[in-house]
Amino acid sequence: MSTEGGFGSTSSSDAQQSLQSFWPRVMEEIRNLTVKDFRVQELPLARIKKIMKLDEDVKMISAEAPVLFAKAAQIFITELTLRAWIHTEDNKRRTLQRNDIAMAITKFDQFDFLIDIVPRDELKPPKRQEEVRQSVTPAEPVQYYFTLAQQPTAVQVQGQQQGQQTTSSTTTIQPGQIIIAQPQQGQTTPVTMQVGEGQQVQIVQAQPQGQAQQAQSGTGQTMQVMQQIITNTGEIQQIPVQLNAGQLQYIRLAQPVSGTQVVQGQIQTLATNAQQITQTEVQQGQQQFSQFTDGQQLYQIQQVTMPAGQDLAQPMFIQSANQPSDGQTPQVTGD
């Protein structure tokens, strides 16, 4: 190895002075070596043997070879560290970095075999920042929006519920036009009833597939018709209303049969005047709500089925959203 420091500066630092006196001091130590000095090495001999065994051509290693290699490696590392420390002092730092060792390797020819092992430019690949997008599906509560306008009236109902199906549709009826609901799978024959002059109400009752639905009108039952009026102060007033035989028969036909079956109804209003009708089907447990419009009024029918074997009243409520001119909005209760 070279014995010259290779520095031309007049004012030498401590590292440069140590490097200049390095090889004379090493040669003096080698001449004064004894057998006892080879027993203790600064570098572990097991690691030196492991490096030597990496060569496939090496079959056997003598006892003296690791000792000599350990001493040579110690001298080599000391010289390389001194040359790298000079570069550290030139940059006015007190910490030895990998870049300092790379600069020492490139400046001196005896370290050329380390250029591929210790590259000069320590380039770290940029880390790729992957954006993780999480789509949180909020809960879908049941929301109903009712919109009431002037004639022709339009009532729109929108509902969403997880695990439950709610259908909403809007139909426009022209004067003299008749619309018949298409029976779905499991529905019985539509029942048509005359309610008022120039107005027809058609009720279609649906039943689960494979089950028979029988509409029976209870004999001996008394029907009491009440008018429900909501005042400006929010109070609810009930006034008895007289209905003809045809309307009472229509109410009896609309009532469900006692049992555990759930009845799902569709109501369509056929009017001669131009109006818009909203059909809403909401099935919750054993309760069913149906809504239809008549002119500027919104009617809501609630049907409740009771378990079989219980002799309880089966109410059916028909209530209006606003009060007409004659002040008669029927609410029908079946006892």
UniProtKB/Swiss-Prot annotation:
Subunit-level organization: Heterotrimeric transcription factor composed of three components, NF-YA, NF-YB and NF-YC. NF-YB and NF-YC must interact and dimerize for NF-YA association and DNA binding.
The protein's role, per its UniProt record: Component of the sequence-specific heterotrimeric transcription factor (NF-Y) which specifically recognizes a 5'-CCAAT-3' box motif found in the promoters of its target genes. NF-Y can function as both an activator and a repressor, depending on its interacting cofactors.
Location of this chain's protein in the cell: Nucleus
Top-rank taxon, per record: Eukaryota
Family: Belongs to the NFYC/HAP5 subunit family.
GO cellular component entries: CCAAT-binding factor complex; nucleoplasm; nucleus; protein-DNA complex; RNA polymerase II transcription regulator complex
Protein's name in the database: Nuclear transcription factor Y subunit gamma
GO MF annotations, alphabetized: DNA binding; DNA-binding transcription activator activity, RNA polymerase II-specific; DNA-binding transcription factor activity; protein heterodimerization activity; RNA polymerase II cis-regulatory region sequence-specific DNA binding
InterPro entries per record: Histone-fold, Histone_H2A/H2B/H3, Transcr_DNA_Rep_Reg
Keywords: Activator, DNA-binding, Nucleus, Transcription, Transcription regulation
One of the GO biological process terms: transcription by RNA polymerase II
Pfam families: Histone
